[in-house]
């Protein structure tokens, strides 16, 4: 205890910031110094589920006790800087209380706000207080569940990270209004709930944006229905983000569409899992991508003609085989990626019918004769098309160093599995250094 007491205030505050707020306040009992030391901690976390009545058996959290604790904690820090406020609230929370707490934090120079509702039955008036939308110091805003109602007057000039999980929106334009008010935003994460069946109109014109993620709610099964497949989607995407490095879009709603891609020329890593009528407008805008993961379902894919090597920087390609269009897409990407080094083929989702037909390229793609080194094939089933593709790669990839296969049948016919692996082992390989691995 003596050794801790001799630490500098800055170091001691850093140590205390890793504790929960209740534990931090209890340190006041340790010594006279700690009575004021906790006031220097720039981070406060409050969870109403930890405030239970002192009775046996299951009880709802004592919200009155929790509210008094938060009030006391915030008001006792008058004049002190509060950098981070984390509120984890249940169904008993009051909008008026949230407005007061966030308002106090804004006046104390709030830099990071995390607000999470643990219950789907959040208050109807659960929108954020107006003072937050003009907070000049706010850098990080993370919201989970709740209701977003963005006022006309909004300016978040310092906000760099915005995370919205399972949110409901007051109208179609409120999200656009919020994004337009964040001139230095660098990271945007949006996760839609399975209960949200409407499409979001996305117009993202953010010169500083570096990372963009749009995902459905984490998969849950209800009566055999995968709700992540029917969550809301993106409609009419407009994207102008010249600083964007990482792009991750998962939208299987069938609502996905692209209106205009102005500039995403800096993207180096991208994941696209979308059901769309014409996904190539987005795909072929990724001119600088080095690593791409694709699961595309399209009624029609029109591959650009006359562009030459569209993906001249692409080093790693990952393709999902669940959609019937995957093989045609894969061959086109081989032809358009002269520097490709690594390939991963995987069945990430249930297979759709009909299955693709193998059409050998008219000429050998340049990457097969100059750069492709590794192949990883997960969920290899030994179908006719898969055999044709693997044989073609073995015969043409002169730089192959390693090809690994994981069989689809983990508990199926052992003889069929053995025969499938033997066929792969006996396939002629043009590369003398190619190592064949079976997992």
Swiss-Prot record:
Listed Gene3D superfamilies: 1.20.1280.50, Ribonuclease Inhibitor
Domain FBD, first and last residues per copy: 358-406
F-box domain span: 1-61
InterPro entries: F-box-like_dom_sf, F-box_dom, FBD, FBL13/AtMIF1-like, LRR_dom_sf, LRR_FXL15/At3g58940/PEG3-like
Pfam families per the UniProt record, alphabetical: F-box (PF00646), FBD (PF08387), LRR_At5g56370 (PF24758)
SUPFAM superfamilies referenced in this protein's UniProt entry, alphabetically: F-box domain (SSF81383), RNI-like (SSF52047)
Name of the featured protein: FBD-associated F-box protein At5g56380
Native source organism of the sequence: Arabidopsis thaliana
């Amino acid at each position: 205890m003596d050794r801790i007491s001799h630490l500098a205030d800055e170091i001691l505050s850093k140590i205390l910031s890793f504790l929960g707020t209740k534990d931090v306040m209890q340190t006041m009992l340790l010594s006279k110094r700690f009575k004021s030391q906790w006031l220097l901690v720039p981070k406060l976390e409050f969870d109403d589920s930890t405030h239970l009545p002192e009775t046996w058996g299951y009880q709802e959290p004592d919200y009155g006790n929790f509210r008094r604790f938060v009030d006391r904690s915030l008001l006792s820090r008058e004049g002190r800087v509060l950098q981070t406020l984390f509120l984890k609230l249940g169904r008993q929370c009051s909008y008026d209380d949230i407005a007061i707490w966030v308002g106090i934090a804004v006046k104390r120079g709030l830099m990071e706000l995390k607000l999470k509702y643990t219950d789907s039955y959040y208050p109807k008036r659960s929108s954020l207080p107006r003072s937050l939308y003009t907070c000049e110091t706010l850098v990080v805003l993370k919201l989970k569940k709740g209701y977003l109602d963005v006022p006309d007057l909004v300016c978040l000039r310092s906000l760099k990270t915005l995370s919205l999980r399972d949110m409901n929106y007051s109208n179609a334009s409120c999200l656009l209004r919020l994004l337009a008010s964040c001139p230095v935003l660098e990271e945007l994460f949006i996760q839609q709930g399975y209960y949200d069946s409407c499409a979001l109109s996305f117009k993202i014109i953010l010169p500083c944006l570096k990372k963009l993620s749009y995902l459905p709610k984490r998969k849950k099964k209800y009566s055999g229905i995968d709700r992540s497949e029917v969550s809301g989607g993106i409609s009419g995407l407009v994207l102008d983000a010249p600083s964007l490095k990482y792009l991750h879009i998962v939208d299987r709603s069938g609502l996905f569409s692209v209106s205009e891609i102005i500039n995403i020329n800096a993207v180096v890593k991208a994941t696209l899992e979308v059901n769309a009528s014409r996904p190539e407008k987005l795909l072929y805008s990724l001119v600088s991508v080095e690593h791409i993961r694709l699961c595309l379902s399209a009624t029609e894919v029109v591959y650009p003609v006359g562009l030459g090597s569209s993906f001249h920087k692409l080093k790693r390609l990952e393709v999902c085989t669940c959609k019937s269009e995957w093989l045609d897409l894969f061959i086109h990407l081989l032809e358009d990626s002269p520097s490709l080094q690594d390939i991963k083929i995987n069945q990430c989702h249930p297979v759709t019918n009909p299955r693709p037909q193998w059409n050998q390229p008219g000429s050998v793609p340049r990457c097969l004769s100059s750069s492709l080194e590794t192949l990883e094939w997960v969920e290899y089933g030994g179908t006719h098309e898969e055999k044709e593709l693997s044989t073609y790669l073995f015969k043409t990839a002169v730089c192959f160093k390693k090809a690994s296969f994981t069989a689809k049948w983990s508990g199926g016919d052992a003889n069929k599995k053995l025969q499938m692996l033997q066929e792969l082992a006996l396939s002629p390989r043009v590369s003398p250094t190619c190592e064949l691995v079976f997992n």
